[in-house]
């Protein structure tokens, strides 16, 4: 490495360290970022709502106990799409000035006198609107006994509390909430806390709930409807899983998971769950994802309910992980809340990290450590491109708040915590975390609070190390070479920023590197541009870096070590095989390694024995799927399909189509993945088998086993002729649950026939499908390269209608056009996306467009570089694989 390059790295390190000292202070309410002034602080909130699931409007009354810290002329708080009917401060009438752009009300005394410091009672009467797109207070329709009925539910994170009640809608404002709901008799009402009393009032019933602990407004939850419930206890806490009528038994798996998780988290934190009950609510139709509201966690049905007759291992794994993530939030996020949205990674990264730990603890048969690299692939790919950002990326604009709810926050943030845990040790990590929770409970926190307690527990300068990961974008490529000297192994390490975009500012990380040498695993801190290690002995197998694949960095081995690892590939530990395959493909994507080297590793897969085959196939699928997009409509497309089939078809032959008694969950996952991949790569035998299984199920001769049901339906959808397409369409329109809605929607959207694809696009505008499914059909159609232009044009033409159905949750409308653009592989498409997105979605659409544009540009680069020269390598790969049969 040149002296100049070393100087650049040194300067980068000094800059990051200086920024860390300035940018990671401990929590202070007065200096916490936000749009509202800190001169008026809410201390208690009595909220009364009149709600009817069949109505599209509601009324509310809010009584806020305020502390005015200094004399002010007016009070400013958040309100959006609310109509004020009356406003008083004590007995003083207030004029309400509405600002829908900034989503605020300014309340000014009509007597012209200032508001003095001290305690005040603010009274507000208002009207609001019930939504239909899964944010704020929304209706969730579902079929029951041949009719459509509705429940009401809430999703207030990040900035939707203000659409349900006037509020100080920022995380730093923690307030006690006391909720009263007036609803028609016959409906049950749920909220964060237990019901304290209820009284009938004519056709209505008034429900009073116990006051909450101090918490931010976005955690308030209410639901009104008819519910079936499963109940249990764990750690002395009453637990329930609630769902729409008729789906009670589908909550059994989630309830069993909850009974395991709550005591586990109590023990891990040394702090018991803080509320007197915990409910999990499955919300049909318009709900997306899940929300950790304290005491009343809500989920999309498919994220919580498990039907044993139709659900395999992968579905159970996803549900367990989502439940674990949301329950972890009861500590990370609820008990201790991020100080502002720019610190939201403290909530989400910790929940991701702890959910993974808990899932592996209770389900070792799933071999989750082998999946860790695959789970990081999306974040690594994003962070290597031009459209990335730092985990802590500065002030967050409210109209773009969901830009930070992404894989950088969740997956990269979780990986950073894993690396820190390895570096300071699990005991120090857990002790520091317990001290952090004790110190900040019922309050807010910043990264500085966390690093302080980790440092105190471990004696390390955790803040300086962590800042190189949280306060700058990107991640390192660690270059390694080794040789034997005098009975020792001399390991030379170097680091530089890894990029697939061809240009990035120089950066330096302090990397907790895990290495495996002669069977011993150790962690070292690479905190310089280059570093030399002397390790005992000269084993035959080269020193492995990041052997578990959970470190957020890539590794490039020197030619001699790379050749040695490739030769010994089948004998490497399973996680190291996955990681080496992952890094080899990423380096080939970036043009730093011949793609033929990656193909050579693929040919070694059939030799691999033992655990981890499903993780290896999933990792191979990631690379092959990318190449299928990059090489679409090029001369290399056909040989790629042949090579993929030659690799994967023998694997499916080995495991067979039908599950066997006593087979492992890994075998089940492997079979499903192979069916889907081989159908995607047009393997004729697999397609014929899938269609035969589907036809037998449709005719009532042989129901599809749960273990292959999803895979067979997806494969059938891709290759369905017109009659089978009609059968799948009928199943979609009469689906009784979200799992099947999404399954049939995906299957139909993947169909190869352009005429049938156009029919799927038309479905997105039909009212029969709920708003959490319909607007995403064009994006799923666009995943097929041959249909991408059709799907893109459809979204652009019908953007207003689709945007209304998609709504604002998770920045949904800003993703409509980018979601239909993933499979393009030419620069003209990237330029068109930028222009059309600006025209349709404006500034809030910039980040989604940038992310997908970066993906298109990478696919274009690989197409230009590889489409001609890869043909012979792919043909040779297929011949070699077939010769081993």
Task: Tell me what each language-model feature is.
Residues 2-3, 151, 209, 238-496, ...:
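Hydrophobic alpha-helical and helix-loop surface patches within well-folded domains
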Residues 8-17:
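Bacterial N-terminal signal peptides
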Residues 21-59, 145-151, 171, 463:
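N-terminal, polar/Ser/Thr-rich
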Residues 36, 125-227, 250-253, 394, ...:
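Extended, low-hydrophobicity, Ser/Thr/Pro/Gly-biased non-transmembrane segments
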Residues 63-81, 177-184, 494, 498-513:
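Surface-exposed beta-strand/loop patches in extracellular or lumenal glycoproteins
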Residues 79-144, 201-202, 530-538:
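A surface-exposed beta-strand-loop module
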Residues 84-89, 462-463, 473-546:
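Beta-strand-rich binding/interaction modules
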Residues 376-378, 384, 503-506, 516-525, ...:
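Long, ordered, helix-rich scaffold segments
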């Amino acid at each position: 490495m040149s002296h100049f390059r070393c100087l650049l790295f040194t300067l980068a390190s000094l800059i990051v360290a200086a920024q860390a000292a300035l940018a990671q202070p401990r929590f202070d309410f007065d200096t916490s970022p936000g749009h509202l002034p800190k001169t008026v602080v809410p201390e208690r909130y009595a909220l009364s709502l009149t709600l009817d699931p069949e109505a599209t409007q509601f009324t509310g009354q809010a009584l806020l106990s305020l502390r005015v810290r200094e004399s002010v002329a007016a009070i400013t708080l958040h309100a959006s799409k609310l109509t004020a009917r009356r406003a008083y401060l004590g007995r003083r009438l207030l004029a309400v000035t509405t600002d829908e752009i900034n989503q605020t009300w300014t309340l000014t005394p009509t007597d012209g006198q200032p508001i003095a410091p001290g305690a005040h009672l603010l009274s507000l009467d208002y009207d609001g609107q019930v939504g239909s797109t899964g944010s704020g207070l929304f209706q969730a329709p579902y079929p029951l006994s041949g009719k459509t009925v509705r429940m009401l539910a809430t999703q207030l994170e990040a900035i939707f509390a203000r659409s349900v009640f006037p509020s100080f809608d920022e995380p730093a404002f923690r307030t006690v909430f006391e909720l009263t709901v007036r609803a028609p008799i016959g409906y049950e009402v749920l909220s964060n806390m237990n019901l304290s009393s209820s009284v009938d009032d004519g056709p209505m019933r008034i429900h009073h709930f116990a006051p909450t602990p101090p918490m931010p407004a976005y955690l308030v939850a209410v639901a009104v409807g008819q519910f079936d419930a499963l109940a249990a206890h764990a750690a002395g806490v009453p637990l329930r899983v609630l769902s729409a009528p008729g789906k009670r038994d589908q909550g059994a798996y989630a309830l069993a998971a909850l009974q395991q998780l709550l005591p586990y988290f109590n023990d891990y934190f040394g702090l018991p769950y803080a509320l007197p009950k915990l409910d999990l609510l499955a919300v049909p139709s318009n709900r997306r994802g899940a929300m950790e509201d304290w005491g009343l966690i809500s989920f999309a049905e498919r994220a919580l309910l498990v039907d044993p007759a139709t659900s395999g291992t992968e579905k159970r794994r996803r549900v367990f992980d989502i439940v674990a993530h949301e329950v972890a939030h009861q500590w990370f996020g609820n008990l201790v809340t991020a100080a502002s949205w720019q610190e939201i990674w403290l909530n989400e990264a910790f929940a991701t990290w702890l959910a993974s730990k808990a899932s592996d603890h209770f389900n070792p048969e799933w071999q989750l450590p082998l999946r860790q690299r695959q789970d990081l692939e999306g974040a690594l790919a994003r962070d290597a491109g031009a459209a990335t950002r730092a985990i802590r990326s500065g002030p967050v604009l409210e109209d773009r708040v969901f830009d930070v709810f992404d894989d950088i926050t969740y997956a990269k943030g979780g990986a950073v915590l894993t690396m820190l845990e390895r570096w300071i040790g699990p005991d120090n990590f857990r002790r520091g975390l317990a001290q952090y929770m004790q110190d900040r409970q019922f309050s807010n926190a910043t990264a500085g609070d966390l690093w302080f307690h980790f440092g105190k527990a471990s004696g390390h300068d955790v803040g300086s190390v962590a800042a190189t990961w949280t306060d700058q974008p990107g991640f390192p490529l660690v270059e390694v070479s080794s040789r034997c000297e005098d009975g020792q192994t001399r390991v030379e390490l170097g680091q530089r920023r890894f990029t697939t975009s061809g240009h990035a500012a120089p950066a330096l990380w302090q990397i907790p590197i895990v290495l495996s040498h002669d069977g011993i695993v150790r962690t070292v801190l690479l905190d310089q541009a280059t570093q030399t290690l002397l390790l005992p002995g000269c084993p035959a197998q080269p020193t492995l870096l990041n052997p578990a694949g959970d470190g957020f960095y890539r590794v490039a081995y020197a030619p001699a070590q790379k050749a040695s690892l490739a030769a010994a590939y089948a004998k490497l530990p399973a996680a190291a095989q996955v990681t080496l395959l992952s890094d080899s493909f990423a380096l080939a994507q970036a043009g730093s390694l011949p793609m033929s080297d990656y193909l050579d590793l693929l040919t070694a897969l059939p030799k691999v024995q033992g655990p981890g085959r499903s993780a290896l196939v999933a990792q191979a699928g990631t690379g092959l799927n990318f190449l299928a997009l990059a090489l679409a409509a090029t001369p290399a497309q056909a040989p790629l399909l042949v090579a993929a089939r030659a690799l994967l078809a023998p694997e499916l032959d080995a495991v067979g189509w039908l599950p066997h008694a006593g087979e492992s969950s890994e075998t089940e996952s492997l079979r499903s993945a192979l069916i889907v991949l081989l159908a995607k790569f047009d393997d004729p035998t697999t397609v014929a088998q899938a269609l035969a299984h589907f036809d037998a199920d449709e005719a009532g001769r042989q129901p599809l086993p749960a273990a292959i049901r999803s895979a067979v339906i997806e494969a059938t959808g891709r290759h369905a002729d017109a009659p089978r397409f009609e059968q799948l369409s009928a199943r979609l329109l009469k689906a009784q649950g979200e799992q099947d809605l999404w399954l049939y929607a995906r299957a139909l959207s993947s169909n190869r026939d352009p005429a049938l694809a156009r029919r799927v696009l038309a479905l997105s505008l039909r009212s029969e499908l709920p708003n959490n499914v319909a607007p995403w059909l064009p994006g799923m159609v666009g995943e097929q390269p041959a249909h991408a232009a059709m799907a893109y044009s459809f979204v652009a033409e019908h953007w207003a209608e689709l945007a209304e159905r998609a709504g604002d949750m998770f920045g949904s409308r800003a993703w409509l056009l980018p979601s239909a653009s993933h499979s393009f592989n030419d620069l003209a498409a990237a330029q068109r996306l930028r222009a059309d997105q600006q025209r349709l979605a404006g500034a809030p659409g910039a980040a989604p467009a940038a992310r997908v544009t970066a993906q298109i540009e990478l696919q274009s680069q690989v197409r230009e570089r590889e489409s001609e020269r890869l043909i012979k390598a792919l043909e040779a790969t297929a011949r070699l694989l077939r010769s081993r049969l």
